[in-house]
């Protein structure tokens, strides 16, 4: 194994041991010393906290007003039933939330297989027990809301302003969206030729059956790679804030007086006084204009009316006039 002293080893062996449909062991080697813990801990945290999945978030049980109660003919109390519902493994295709229904009567266990659902929903563990009915006349009816999410979201975090509008009897459930039930990693020694200081990463994990363990690790690695992309080329990814520069003067003030369409007599009088722009004109007062040769009161009235129609008037004060664009002409 020859190479540059600065060159890092890349894993060449990936072994996947499928213990069961929900349990797998993944071995990755060789890794440079220390990278076993670096990658193992990062993948473990992502698998536990950031994997998307579906979970029960709300439940309505006929005859039950709150979670601190019991139901006649049912062995478990309501809190225990809610706890069992948290363990319900559900796969939902193409939807972010669905409503499932359950109706069961007679003595015996109530399982996930008793839940009624459409073709977009799959109950992964139909044998999962929700409660037990202890009387021939006992019955239980539920409406179960399943939502898509990520990580763990307690019911208290979903209580907001609409809480007061929530119907009595609708029970909130702590939502554990992550399909990963258990994850552990171990770093063992590995050897390549003469090097004996290398790492071998062994990841062992169990899921609830809604995702294949191999696929879960693949997704976690993808999430990690996407988050690290920003460090590959360290640039400020924030978009620069574009500040709109407000013009120093109203654009109409920069237009020539010819745009006012005054009579020939009035226009010629203004040009004789070097009044070429509307900004020049509005700074003049009535007294100043009346001193202009050949400009009488009739022309003054015309000018005032035309300016008023554009929201302007005589005698205005303009700081820093004329602007550089005009002064240079």
Curated annotation (Swiss-Prot):
InterPro entries: DNA-dir_RNA_pol_insert, DNA-dir_RNA_pol_RpoA/D/Rpb3, DNA-dir_RpoA, RBP11-like, RNAP_asu_C, RNApol_insert_sf. DNA-dependent RNA polymerase catalyzes the transcription of DNA into RNA using the four ribonucleoside triphosphates as substrates. One of its GO terms (cellular component) is DNA-directed RNA polymerase complex. This is DNA-directed RNA polymerase subunit alpha. The keyword Iron-sulfur does not apply. It is an enzyme of class 2 (transferase). GO terms for molecular function: DNA binding; DNA-directed RNA polymerase activity; protein dimerization activity. Homodimer. The RNAP catalytic core consists of 2 alpha, 1 beta, 1 beta' and 1 omega subunit. When a sigma factor is associated with the core the holoenzyme is formed, which can initiate transcription. Residues 1-235 are annotated as: Alpha N-terminal domain (alpha-NTD). Its EC number is 2.7.7.6.
């Amino acid at each position: 194994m020859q190479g540059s002293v600065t060159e890092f080893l890349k894993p060449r062996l990936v072994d996947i041991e499928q213990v069961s449909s929900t349990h797998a062991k993944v071995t990755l080697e060789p890794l440079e010393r220390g990278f076993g813990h670096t990658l193992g801990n990062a993948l473990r945290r992502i698998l536990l906290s950031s994997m998307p999945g579906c979970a029960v978030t709300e439940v309505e049980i006929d005859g039950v007003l709150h979670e601190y109660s019991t139901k006649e003919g049912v062995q478990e109390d309501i809190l225990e039933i809610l706890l069992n519902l948290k363990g319900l493994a559900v796969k939902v295709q193409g939807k972010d939330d669905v409503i499932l229904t359950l109706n069961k009567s007679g003595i015996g266990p109530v399982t996930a297989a008793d839940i009624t659902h459409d073709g977009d929903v799959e109950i992964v563990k139909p044998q999962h027990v929700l409660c037990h009915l202890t009387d021939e006349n006992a019955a239980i009816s539920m409406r179960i809301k399943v939502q898509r999410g990520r990580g763990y979201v307690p019911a208290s975090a979903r209580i907001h302003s609409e809480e007061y509008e929530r119907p009595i009897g609708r029970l909130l459930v702590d939502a554990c969206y992550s399909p990963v039930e258990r994850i552990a990693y171990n770093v063992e020694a590995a050897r390549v030729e003469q090097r004996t200081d290398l790492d071998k990463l062994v990841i062992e994990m169990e899921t609830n059956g809604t995702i294949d363990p191999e696929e879960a690790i693949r997704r976690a690695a993808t999430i990690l790679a996407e988050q690290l992309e920003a460090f590959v080329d360290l640039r400020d990814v924030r978009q620069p804030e574009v500040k709109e520069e407000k013009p120093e003067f109203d654009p109409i003030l920069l237009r020539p007086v010819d745009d006012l369409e005054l009579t020939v007599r009035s226009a010629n009088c203004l040009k004789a006084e070097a009044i070429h722009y509307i900004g020049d004109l509005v700074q003049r007062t009535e007294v100043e204009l009346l001193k202009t040769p050949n400009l009488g009161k009739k022309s003054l009235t015309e000018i005032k009316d035309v300016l008023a129609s554009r929201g302007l008037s005589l005698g205005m004060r303009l700081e820093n006039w004329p602007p550089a664009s005009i002064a240079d002409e």
